[in-house]
Curated annotation (Swiss-Prot):
Residues 187-467, 565-658, 670-714 are annotated as: Disordered. This is Transcription factor SFL2. Residues 193-207, 223-235, 286-296 have a biased composition (Pro residues). Belongs to the HSF family. GO terms for molecular function: DNA-binding transcription activator activity; DNA-binding transcription factor activity; sequence-specific DNA binding. Pfam families: HSF_DNA-bind (PF00447). Induction: Induced at high temperature and during human oral epithelium infection. Transcription factor that plays a role of activator of filamentous growth and which is involved in invasive growth at a high temperature. Required for human oral epithelium colonization and damage. Promotes filamentous growth in EFG1- and FLO8-dependent manners. Antagonizes functions of SFL1. Keywords: Activator, DNA-binding, Nucleus, Transcription, Transcription regulation, Virulence. The lineage of its organism: Eukaryota, Fungi, Dikarya, Ascomycota, Saccharomycotina. Residues 266-275, 310-321, 354-372, 413-435, 444-461, 599-608 have a biased composition (Polar residues). InterPro entries: HSF_DNA-bd, WH-like_DNA-bd_sf, WH_DNA-bd_sf. One of its GO terms (cellular component) is nuclear chromosome. The gene is SFL2. Residues 276-285, 376-389, 574-591, 609-641, 648-658 have a biased composition (Low complexity).
Amino acid sequence: MSKKNPGDPRVKKNAFVHKLYTMLHDPALSHLIWWTNRNGEQNTFALCPGKEFADCLTQYFKHGNVASFVRQLHMYGFHKVSDPLPITYPPNGNNNNNNNNKEVPPVWEFKHSSGRFKRGDETSLVYIKRRSSSNHTSGSTIYAEPIYNPLLTNPYNQPQFMYQDYSMGPPVEVQQFYNYQNQPLMYYQQPPGQVPPPPPPSLPPHQQPEMALQYHQYNNYQQPPPAPPAPPPQPGNVLFGYQQVAPPQQPGSTVQQIPANAPPTLDQTQPLSYTPQLEYQQQQYPQPPLPPPPPQLQLQTSPGIPKVNDNLSRPSPNEQHLQFRKIWPDENNEANSKPRNPSLMFDPLLRVNSEGSPKTQPNHSVSLLNNEVRSESSTSSSSTTVTSTALPPPSAIDRSVSLVGGSPFDLSSRMNNQQSFNRTPSISTPPTQNGRLPKISSPLIPSNTESQSPTMVTGTDNDVGVTSKGSTSIISVSKKPSVFSNSLQERLRPSMFEYHPIGNNLSKDVLTIPKISTNSNSGSRTTSQSSMSSASALSSKKSSLSSISSTHGNLSILNSTNYRSTSVGGSGSGPFSTSTSTSTTSPTLSSLLHHPQHEPQNSTIANGTSIRSSISSSQSISSPPLTTTTTTTTTDQRQLSNSPISRQQQQQPNNNTNKKVSVTSLLLPSHSQSQGYAQPLYKSSVIAEEENSTTSSGGGYRSKSDDDTDNMNK
């Protein structure tokens, strides 16, 4: 008991061993744990595992678990003594109790493997230490035998056994081969239980080194790039002879030629290093070698590639009749050609020669800037035909003045918009043919209008052309500022009225040329090919109030539009002034052609048909004198409230900054309007100016300039 004190300072070094030694020398625990005498040496101790011993453990440790205490004994090198020897109980222990309770489980006896844990030898406790996880040599053989596994200590054993399973032969040559290469054999990264079953024993003997070569080459494929040097040829070793075969084939054919008796793990990942061994198989087996597939594929595909190229480069005879719509014009079939709708975002003053519309230019294309009347123009001017095809009208664009065919707006609400137009009976239209629209003509020379869709062109039912013996001219009320370009894009060009908002009152001057003979048999006919304004009774393929030419044959004047023409009585040969009154509507500007002195007749315009309004008498009217009339266009904006475009138009202020002036108006004196000045011929284009106080919204008003020009003519 006196030896307990010297052992106290060493408790911190290995606490468990010193606590165990203290428990063995504690008299209060002598009946639970004590020293035993085995073979005359007191190097063993016994304990009685139970609840009482578990309660005593809490006095020395942080737990009361007997199993944990036994586990700590094993960690420090103690093990059970399994010899069936009689256990000596402590001398002062409860022998009576032990004798009475014979059915108690036997005690556990422990001994240290080194023998240093003895009774009375406390100095030797410093040598007893806890074993680490790597140092298991000090343990008993029960725990040491699974650790010293020969498969783990010798890295060549397990791959060597796997090779024996594959090749069914002795592994001596393989072992020498690895030693010669001086490289350790890589393991297959699969547990040994997943090794496939060995092939049947009828395998020929030459397959054994072959499998060895496969395995070695697979390992070299997994290893880093520095490969071992090629071994010198040895006559006794067959493995090196296999590596010196002809160059390998391409990998595509070698993978397919692996024999069925090869291991599946090698078939799953076949590197390029298997190709020498595969060639050796082809040499060994008597079956004829298969030709390499990649050259066959090249031979099969090589004739096909130039065939595809020939088909691409050499068009088929049916390619001329393709089923897609061409964007270029077809000279052979002009009626079916569909020119593309050109972009509206182009320079309006730039001359564009569109290839999308076939052009038949007239020989009498005269500018608006002519300062004298060319009355020598022949009435037999060449009739220009324009192939009109279905173009989608850009009605979604905010056009201030446009009679776009198929407009989605309700035109019946804008019937009351008026436009008074006074002119002499010098208008007749030639026959129409196949829905073709004429090219624009000069202000001095008439043009033969040919159309089937509603254009506001007055003509006869019998389609009698203008038959004037003398100098005849039809003034085109609707002229663009530039008539130099007669292409489809010029017809789609925005007019001056679309670039600026329109005021309440628009005034335009119309000048007619004397000696116009008109043969009218049964009235006037209104047809349209392009979106024309109500002032398009004069032959013009362009619209002054509308710049969008809808060549689809859309109706500019829809179902609720009334066409009114005055009844002309008798035939006159003197200075006789005849005027027609027409009431049309457009999506944003309503034009009423109304004469102030006559009562109009109403006729409903049908959609998609030739619109005809009868004139009461068929007559031959000749008006020798020159009659200059002033047309006043009045727009009642209260009637435009139903149109979203007109509502936007009403919101725009009528400022002087938005003044609409044509190019030709710059050549006239500024006081010509107020003085009743007879406008020259190039003033015949429609000019929208400031709001004039002399104009009014009533249809029966006649301006001062009208009276002056009539007096001058008389």
